[in-house]
């Protein structure tokens, strides 16, 4: 089924805002993939499972990234864009394109490399951290930024944070959900803030769904946030966030 969806160009991109918690302005957007509405493949989890089942992980990720960049360029957006890429596919992409090839590829979509943030997923499976660190250096040399996704979900590696030195780390929503009611989650976030200061990394709090959680994270000094309370994924990027946030 997924191979057919890819062939028939039935997949589309939606964009969710990432917000500056201090200023209440849009900092960036994350590109997310969706299947045809009203089908089993509308949800991204179903698409990811199908990619796994059909052994199409590489093709699926490349299509997702291409669609996101193509639409971003067509919209003439000047803001930053986060795209998800697994560590394994990132290694393959860089082996194929190299630093200069990557720059040309991004520009071919009408997007400047400095607008792009590669959000690395599934990095817990990395066998060769040194290789990934070298690739991270090449990506940065191309003008692209790096982010680690879902940090703290139990599989993430502090060593990888230290070696890759990503510009951004996204805190797993487990630590932000109902943070206003859990002192231990507050302490965990504060510990991550100390590590982020050492590595000069900006933090994004994922999964912000209530005003109370937003207030706590803002008071803690977390730079950026993402979640349904701030803005749901939509066909078009948001120009500004709603007054409730």
Could you say what each language-model-derived stretch is?
Residues 10-12, 28-30, 80-84, 115-119, ...:
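Structural preference for beta-strand elements that scaffold enzyme active sites
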Residues 1-12, 50-57, 238-245:
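C-di-GMP signaling machinery
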Residues 7, 52, 73, 107-110, ...:
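Residue-level signal for alpha-helix termini/capping positions
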Residues 58-131:
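Catalytic core of bacterial c-di-GMP phosphodiesterases, primarily the EAL and HD-GYP domains
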